[in-house]
Design a protein with these regions (language model features):
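A glycine-rich (often HGG/GG-containing) alpha/beta subdomain
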Residues: 1-136
Length: 136
């Protein structure tokens, strides 16, 4: 897949934690542009299956929200691509701002079902599994 995509991965409504998922070749660089780890580590330098605590910032460096970033390296992710999940506060205003920041960082809006489509096209799911996910 050429484009890197992002979307809110949690249901809308009242929830304490919300997740923004980023997937594609540039997922780590998009996340590095918007997430600053307290440890100063770059997500792009981490091996997979790692988490860092930090903040999501706007272009000026102003904090939007605190977050935990989880890195899943290809092919060991749902989509078989590099994936970053930004877990922040679950309010809709915060999630919209964090999502908008990922777009500014270079991600494109994901179409409905696009993460599952990528998982299918990349061999992570068979047709029956993909159809079952889409039915949920």
């Amino acid at each position: 897949m050429e484009k890197t995509i992002s979307a809110i991965a949690t249901p809308q409504g009242a929830g304490g934690i919300g997740i923004i998922r980023i997937s594609g070749d540039r997922a780590l660089s998009v996340a590095d542009a918007v997430f600053h780890a307290v440890s100063k580590a770059k997500l792009s330098e981490l091996p997979g299956m790692r988490a860092l605590y930090g903040t999501v910032v706007d272009r000026k460096g102003t904090v939007i929200d605190e977050a935990v970033a989880l890195v899943f390296r290809a092919p060991h992710s749902y989509t078989a691509e590099d994936v970053v999940e930004l877990q922040c506060h679950g309010g809709s205003a915060v999630l919209r701002r964090v999502l908008a920041r990922t777009y500014e960082g270079g991600a494109a809006p994901a179409e409905r079902g696009e993460f599952t489509k990528r998982a299918f096209l990349n061999g992570r799911l068979d047709l029956t599994q993909a159809a079952a996910v889409m039915d949920v």
